[in-house]
Every structure is written in C-alpha cells, then in structure tokens.
Amino acid sequence: MRPSSNVTEFVLLGLTQDPDVKKTLFVMFLLIYIVTMVGNLLIWVTTIGSPSLGSLMYFFLAYLSLMDAIYSTAMSPKLMIDLLCDKIAISLSACMGQLFIEHLLGGAEVFLLVVMAYDRYVAISKPLHYLNIMNRLVCILLLVVAMIGGFVHSVVQIVFLYSLPICGPNVIDHSVCDMYPLLELLCLDTYFIGLTVVANGGIICMVIFTFLLISCGVILNFLKTYSQEERHKALPTCISHIIVVALVFVPCIFMYVRPVSNFPFDKLMTVFYSIITLMLNPLIYSLRQSEMKNAMKNLWCEKLSIVRKRVSPTLNIFIPSSKATNRR
C-alpha cells in the first residue's frame, strides 16, 4: 500500500543547528543510552534470574524493562547519528517504520502499566486470592493483550496516515517522525483529522491516566488497613508506579490532547519521553524497592563468586605458588 503522495523523502531539521550544541547533545545522549540499557537489562536479568523475585509483580516489571530497552534502541541511536550529520534525510518508508515502532512500544507500555496497576490492586485488596487470580498463564495473556493493544493503536495510526495526501514541502521541523509534524504536510484541512488523532491517542491517554490515578488512590486507601510494617513494604512499589505513570502519561497528554500544531517545545518533550523517561524508569523501580536492590546485590555477588572460582584454578597454573618459589 502506498500513500497518496509524491513525497518519497523527508528532511528533519533536528534538535539544533549549532555544531557545538550537537556535540554536547551527542555525548549526553550516548551516556543516557548506556545508563538506560544497563539499568533496564540489569533489572530484566535480575528479575528473571533471581529466585527471591518470583512474585508475578516482577514478571511485569521485567518485561517493562525489556520493552524500555528495545524502545531506547529504536530511538536513541538514530537521534545520535543525526546529531553528527549536517543534513538529516529519512525515506518515507523509514519514517513510517519509525512512527510504527514508536507508537507500538509506547502504546504497549501504556497498556502494560494498566496491567501492572491491576496486579497491584489484586495483590493488596485480595492477597489471599492473588495467586488464583493472577497465575502465570493469566499474566502471560495480559502481557500479550498489552502488546496487541499497542499493535492495534500503531496500525491505526499508520493506515490512517497512509490514506492521506502529502503535498509538501518535505521539511519537518522535528527530530523524529511523528503524527502532528507529518499532518502539517497534508494537502487538506487537518481539523477533523486532528480530532481523530486526539481520539486515538490523547483521549485514550487521558482516560487511562485518570483510571490509573483513581486505582492508585484506591490502593493507597487499602493500605490503611495494613500494619505499619506491611505498609512500609508495599508503599515504595505503589509510589514507584505512580511516578512512572506520571512520566509516561504527562508528555503523552501534552503532545496529543490538542489540535494539529507543532511547537518548538515538542522537540524537548519527545527527547524527555523517548530518552530521559526510559533512563529514569529502572532507577525509580530499583532505588525505591529494597527487594530489588537486595536481589541485584545477591545475584551479582553470586555470579562474581562463581566466576572467581572458575578463574582461580586457571590463574594458579600460570602463577607459581610461594612454596615452589622458596624451594627454588
């Protein structure tokens, strides 16, 4: 399927045209990307490999971290490469691919946060029935549903955009391909089209964000009936989830609950959502949860101990013992 357009390539103006600022941003994005990948993959490996994190809550956290790592890899390297180029050109198919991946993973993460909120609600409101309600099969099905939700949302965006005529010019004042910058290139009035985009993106974000805030309030209310020790154990998980929900949904609402328009501030918001937030998520979850920190410490100390035991005999072959040296 081809779009109703003669445009085959777009030129992105990027974040800035200042060479010095580009170099600074490149170094900053590279460091953030490394921290993001290390943090998210560390959580994923720790959650999968640590017996102490056998709770199904950490099952969802593991795949949220994996999703963030994939999202970061899909966005950050392209942004960093663009900072080294004088002209940022992207083909129509690559632009559509970037848009598809962005909304696929972003949509899946939104639905996964809903699933995680439901998981916490069941764990706190019905602790005796938790393992019956949230068994592993149910968790896998909910994870698949979250991915399908993101896929449907992304496909709707792409199919909708492909059916519209793009007249040009082919210059996009943005750092990535996104819906509103592309809609500004259309040959027709974008008012009603913008309402459709708001319905498929912004309103969904607002409704889910409101639902999640209410659910967090209900969960916090349930915690009042718990003992002080149980509250102290459950509260960091709830607070971490609330912070991550705010980091994900506030930029989404800002960018998609409005008429079709492209503001300079959108570039910073895109960087915050697609780079900064993905770095903060693992830090928030790991630093606020003692179970996660202890599991990381125990797992990696155990791994280092195993490596040390395997390496020591090999080193002893090459390093003569003190007794052998004295005999000589």
Curated annotation (Swiss-Prot):
Database matches in PANTHER family: OLFACTORY RECEPTOR
Gene symbol of the encoding locus: OR4A16
Record protein name field: Olfactory receptor 4A16
Intervals, Cytoplasmic compartment: 48-55, 119-137, 218-233, 288-328
SUPFAM superfamilies assigned to the protein according to its UniProt record, in alphabetical order: Family A G protein-coupled receptor-like
Keyword set includes Cell membrane: yes
Record-stated family: Belongs to the G-protein coupled receptor 1 family.
Role noted for this protein: Odorant receptor.
Membrane topology annotation: Multi-pass membrane protein
UniProt-annotated location(s): Cell membrane
Protein species of origin: Homo sapiens
